């Protein structure tokens, strides 16, 4: 199970700019799909290189075709002159990490997962000795709240959180391209750990719930007992609905506690004044199996 997320960095990310004031932009790709990872990217560039960034052709990744996005991303990785203008770092959040975050007892929303990824990337840039003086972020959730959160964490840095940042700021456009190309590549070249996964001849598509190929893949690949493979975000309503309809019903040991408070008063563990002994409640596991304590051997 892939629940770890490592920061991936381009060649010139460490000590980028050698102390020159830089702007950092953040964007993501793959927030909405039911298949594949969500990729967060941060791009950095000297403040005085805005024109050069535009000349590179960066734009909102959704406004560029696949060939153009890959051309720009390849230059970011292979052209030594371009690497002096821009560097980037990525965090690739697996479907399993997303699902586990959203389904665990203390639920962690997708917005919280996204914020953590962005904050980790900013901290990584600072730890790698990048002189970040401005940050531009494409908003996730209420922008004022998000901006206030970042300003509290990173005082002294000018921060702008806004909608459509990927089309307003070239540095965010560059981050958008890095995230989108990486996400598409990881999805296209996905290696299944599970055996005998049924993939339609036309493939599993873009991963978005409305994609006909994605819909077909979900219907074909669901396993009656174990549900979906690691490519699928099981926390998505699209996936959970199929599981409810197609999979064998199951129950968990704590089902009988559903709807009841999981917390107890501290005094509930103490012996009441009127009783000499407290009989602990038997776990449902032992009840269902008619198991008893052995008092003598």
Swiss-Prot record:
Record-linked PROSITE patterns? RNASE_H_2 (PS51975)
Any one Gene Ontology MF annotation carried by this entry is: RNA-DNA hybrid ribonuclease activity
Q: Give the required cofactors.
A: Mn(2+); Mg(2+)
Reactions performed catalytically: Endonucleolytic cleavage to 5'-phosphomonoester
Q: Which Pfam families match?
A: RNase_HII
For the RNase H type-2 domain, which residue ranges apply?
21-248
InterPro entries, per database record: RNase_H2_suA, RNase_HII/HIII, RNase_HII/HIII_dom, RNase_HII_hlx-loop-hlx_cap_dom, RNaseH-like_sf, RNaseH_sf
What detail does the entry give on cofactor binding? Manganese or magnesium. Binds 1 divalent metal ion per monomer in the absence of substrate. May bind a second metal ion after substrate binding.
The family database entries (CDD domains) matched by this protein are listed as:
RNase_HII_eukaryota_like
What keywords are assigned to this protein?
A: Endonuclease, Hydrolase, Metal-binding, Nuclease
Enzyme Commission code: 3.1.26.4
Does the keyword Hydrolase feature in the UniProt annotation?
A: yes
One GO biological process term is: DNA replication, removal of RNA primer
Q: Key word NADP present in the record?
A: no
What GO CC annotations are associated with the protein?
ribonuclease H2 complex
Where along the chain is a divalent metal cation bound?
27-28, 138
Q: What does the protein in this record do?
A: Catalytic subunit of RNase HII, an endonuclease that specifically degrades the RNA of RNA:DNA hybrids. Participates in DNA replication, possibly by mediating the removal of lagging-strand Okazaki fragment RNA primers during DNA replication. Mediates the excision of single ribonucleotides from DNA:RNA duplexes.
Family listed = Belongs to the RNase HII family. Eukaryotic subfamily.
Q: What is this protein called?
A: Ribonuclease H2 subunit A
Give the lineage.
Eukaryota, Metazoa, Ecdysozoa, Nematoda, Chromadorea
């Amino acid at each position: 199970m892939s629940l770890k997320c490592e920061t991936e960095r381009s060649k010139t990310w460490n000590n980028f700019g050698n102390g020159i004031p830089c702007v950092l932009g953040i964007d993501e790709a793959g927030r909405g799909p039911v298949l594949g990872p969500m990729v967060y990217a941060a791009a950095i560039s000297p403040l005085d290189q805005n024109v050069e960034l535009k000349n590179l052709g960066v734009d909102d990744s959704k406004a560029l075709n696949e060939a153009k996005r890959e051309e720009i991303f390849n230059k970011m990785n292979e052209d030594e002159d371009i690497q002096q203008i821009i560097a980037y770092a990525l965090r690739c959040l697996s479907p399993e990490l997303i699902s586990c975050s959203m389904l665990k007892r203390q639920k962690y929303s997708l917005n919280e997962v996204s914020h953590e990824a962005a904050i980790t990337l900013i901290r990584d840039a600072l730890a790698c000795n990048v002189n970040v003086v401005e940050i531009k972020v494409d908003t996730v959730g209420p922008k004022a709240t998000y901006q206030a959160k970042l300003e509290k964490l990173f005082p002294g840095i000018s921060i702008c959180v806004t909608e459509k940042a990927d089309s307003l700021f070239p540095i965010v456009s560059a981050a958008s391209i890095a995230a989108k190309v990486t996400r598409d590549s990881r999805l296209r070249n996905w290696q299944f750990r599970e055996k005998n996964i049924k993939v339609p001849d036309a493939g599993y598509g873009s991963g978005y719930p409305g994609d006909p190929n994605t819909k077909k893949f979900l219907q074909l690949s669901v396993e009656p007992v174990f549900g979906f493979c690691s490519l699928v975000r099981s926390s998505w309503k699209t996936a959970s609905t199929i599981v409810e309809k197609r999979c064998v019903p199951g129950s968990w040991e704590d089902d009988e506690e559903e709807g009841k408070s999981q917390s107890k008063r501290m005094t509930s563990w103490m012996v009441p004044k009127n009783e000499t002994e407290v009989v602990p409640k038997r776990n449902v596991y032992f009840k269902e199996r008619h198991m008893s304590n052995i008092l003598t051997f």
